[in-house]
């Protein structure tokens, strides 16, 4: 029986290393999970507002805490976005969900806004230039004492 001819080097498959269980199912090298949840409406009549819980889980070193939970209202997001725009001129900051003037406390409006705020934060927090270059990003996501007046 004749030996099969050797394939040219370009066609040979490189040696494939078997991955261990830990490599397949372990914590990724860098991960960032941002969730906006649990909207709560406070106040009465013209003083009503809704705030949202921001949950962050990460192992990215620029974030001081591996996990955090803070609450922010829509006006905080507006201020945060303005600060990001001033701070990060090389990055196009995405829009927030639009302001709502009628039925703003209905379940549908609150849920749509929650989804929009979550998408906004995931996009902003996941941007490599903002992760390394923004001073306000980590504070907004993780500091329960965040005060917009410190940044204006």
UniProtKB/Swiss-Prot annotation:
Alphabetical UniProt keywords: Cytoplasm, Golgi apparatus, Lipid-binding, Membrane, Protein transport, Transport
Compartments, record wording: Cytoplasm; Golgi apparatus membrane; Prevacuolar compartment membrane
Biological process annotations from GO: endocytic recycling; late endosome to Golgi transport; protein transport
GO MF term list: phosphatidylinositol-3-phosphate binding
Cited SUPFAM superfamilies: PX domain
Keyword Transport: yes
SMART domains in the record: PX
Pfam families per UniProt: PX
Membrane topology of the entry: Peripheral membrane protein
Residues that coordinate or bind a 1,2-diacyl-sn-glycero-3-phospho-(1D-myo-inositol-3-phosphate): 73, 75, 99, 104, 113
The keyword GTP-binding appears for this protein: no
Domain PX: residue ranges: 30-147
One GO cellular component term noted in the UniProt record for this chain: Golgi membrane
Domain notes: The PX domain binds phosphatidylinositol 3-phosphate which is necessary for peripheral membrane localization.
Role: Required for retention of late Golgi membrane proteins. Component of the retrieval machinery that functions by direct interaction with the cytosolic tails of certain TGN membrane proteins during the sorting/budding process at the prevacuolar compartment. Binds phosphatidylinositol 3-phosphate (PtdIns(P3)).
Family, per entry: Belongs to the sorting nexin family.
Protein's name according to its UniProt entry: Sorting nexin-3
Taxonomic lineage of the native organism: Eukaryota, Fungi, Dikarya, Ascomycota, Saccharomycotina
């Amino acid at each position: 029986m004749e030996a099969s001819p050797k394939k040219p080097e370009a066609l040979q498959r490189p040696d494939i290393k078997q991955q261990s269980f830990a490599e397949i199912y372990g914590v990724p090298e860098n991960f960032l999970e941002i969730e906006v949840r649990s909207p709560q409406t406070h106040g009465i009549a013209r003083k009503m507002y809704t705030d949202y819980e921001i949950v962050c889980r990460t192992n990215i070193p620029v974030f001081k805490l591996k996990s955090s939970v803070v609450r922010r209202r829509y006006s905080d997001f507006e201020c945060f976005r303005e600060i990001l725009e001033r701070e990060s001129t090389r990055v196009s900051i995405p829009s927030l969900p639009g302001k709502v003037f009628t039925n703003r406390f209905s379940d549908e409006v609150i849920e749509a806004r929650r989804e929009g705020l979550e998408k906004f934060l995931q996009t902003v927090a996941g941007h490599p230039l903002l992760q390394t270059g923004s001073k306000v990003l980590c504070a907004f996501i993780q500091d329960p004492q965040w005060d917009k007046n410190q940044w204006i």
